């Protein structure tokens, strides 16, 4: 086919999958609301890649914006060892296209698959995983970016326990000005089980602490082998958090922006905080101290990423000289674009420009460009976790709660529903 010169067509999950002719598709990895993913091998270098076909890019304006955001952020964070590396991009049929291909690092599975495999994990595993998440998050936050959807399914892991953060489709910018942060939310919200309480309760603004809460939920899941706050809906999610962390103090209660939610919490019986040592009796006391600081109900009391990296629990890994900041902040100016036609043009320009850049660099260096390798040795992965990839928790459109009434609807949309 003339319009596919230099490319080959494979069937992946019964869909046409158009890849660069240098690659051969080797395995179907996963499919979901935003696309399908397969493993492929570069026939020239024998290196593996994951190829993600982002589908229906322009079926909704919010999906086009999500695709543009992901493409831009993956380029901006390219090269950090704890963030998935973008190798290449392609739009095989640029005329009126509705799909984009992303060539990324091939990882063996995600952290959700490892946890759900039931294989025993050690405290050394927990330390390694949390340290790497925080290193990646420090880099992300230093660019004034909030990830907003950290969860085990968005943490990719290799057999040597090398971990990389992926999926930036829900990311937003952060400003020290609360008024600017207040305008950055969308209809799609982070997965309920890992969502910070200040989002549900409509606090005045969001801070980097929302991502720290998610890391705390992940640490608790590692310690317990299952999601820590697994709410059936948003009211149940809030109840589960309060059941463990106890009734907030008056200062925190007064910051709840939703009158209905504030009244609901005030009318609940007083609940004492449950000690994490009773919930995780076999855990390292340092891990429980870090967990307690990450899962502080009030975001202003929550530990920062920088402080967490210096916590005694991570002392074995911590090396300030090997925990870099991003050299430049990320520009979110494109978020103001609302015209789908303009977004289509911007995505085309991003893809074509990046293709030129990586081909120039590859030509100079003689091969595929990868991210940095970990600076410290890793602990081995339990055998049962390998070979599974991108298991999914509830997707944003599955728990939106747009049609929910009363308190459930307010908690589902959080501050977004009040702006």
UniProtKB/Swiss-Prot annotation:
Gene encoding the protein: spm1
Family: Belongs to the protein kinase superfamily. Ser/Thr protein kinase family. MAP kinase subfamily.
Catalytic activity reported: L-seryl-[protein] + ATP = O-phospho-L-seryl-[protein] + ADP + H(+); L-threonyl-[protein] + ATP = O-phospho-L-threonyl-[protein] + ADP + H(+)
Chain sites annotated for binding ATP: 29-37, 52
Post-translational modification: Phosphorylated by the MAP kinase kinase mkk1.
Coiled-coil parts of chain: none
Name used for this protein in its record: Mitogen-activated protein kinase spm1
Keyword Transferase: yes
GO cellular-component term (any): cytoplasm
GO MF terms held by the record: ATP binding; MAP kinase activity; protein serine kinase activity
Ranges where the Protein kinase domain occurs: 23-314
């Amino acid at each position: 086919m003339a319009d596919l010169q230099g490319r080959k067509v494979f069937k992946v999950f019964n869909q046409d999958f158009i890849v660069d002719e240098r690659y051969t598709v080797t395995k179907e990895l996963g499919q979901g609301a935003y696309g399908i993913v397969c493993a492929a091998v570069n026939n020239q270098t024998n290196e593996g890649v994951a190829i993600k076909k982002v589908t229906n890019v322009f079926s909704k304006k919010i999906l086009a914006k999500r695709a543009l955001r992901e493409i831009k952020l993956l380029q901006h964070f390219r090269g950090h060892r704890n963030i998935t590396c973008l190798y290449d991009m392609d739009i095989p049929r640029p005329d009126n296209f509705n799909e984009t291909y992303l060539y990324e690092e091939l990882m063996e599975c995600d952290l959700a698959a490892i946890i759900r495999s039931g294989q025993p994990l050690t405290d050394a595993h927990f330390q390694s995983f949390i340290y790497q998440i925080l290193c990646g998050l420090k880099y992300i936050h230093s660019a004034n970016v909030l990830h907003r959807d950290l969860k085990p399914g968005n943490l990719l892991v290799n057999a040597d326990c090398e971990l990389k953060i992926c999926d930036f489709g829900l990311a937003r910018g952060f400003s020290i000005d609360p008024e600017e942060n207040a305008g950055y939310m969308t209809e799609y919200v982070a997965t309920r089980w890992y969502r910070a309480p200040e989002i549900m309760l409509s606090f005045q603004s969001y801070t980097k602490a929302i991502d720290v809460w998610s890391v705390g939920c992940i640490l608790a899941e590692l310690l317990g082998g299952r999601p820590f706050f697994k709410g059936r809906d948003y009211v149940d999610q809030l109840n589960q958090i309060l059941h463990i962390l106890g009734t907030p103090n008056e200062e925190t209660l007064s910051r709840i922006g939703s009158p209905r939610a504030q009244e609901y919490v005030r009318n609940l019986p007083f609940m004492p905080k449950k000690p994490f040592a009773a919930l995780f009796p076999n855990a390292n006391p340092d891990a429980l101290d870090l967990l307690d600081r990450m899962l502080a109900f009030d975001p202003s009391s929550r530990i920062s990423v920088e402080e967490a990296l210096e916590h005694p629990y991570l002392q074995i890994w911590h090396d300030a000289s090997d925990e870099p900041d991003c050299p430049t902040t990320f520009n979110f100016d494109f978020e103001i674009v609302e015209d789908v036609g303009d977004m289509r043009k911007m995505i085309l320009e991003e893809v074509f420009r990046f293709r030129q850049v990586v081909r120039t660099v590859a030509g100079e260096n003689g091969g595929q460009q990868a991210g940095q390798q970990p600076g410290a040795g890793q602990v081995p992965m339990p055998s049962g976790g390998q070979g599974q990839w991108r298991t999914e928790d509830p997707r944003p459109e599955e728990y939106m709660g747009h049609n929910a009434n009363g308190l459930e609807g307010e908690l589902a949309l959080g501050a977004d529903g009040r702006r």
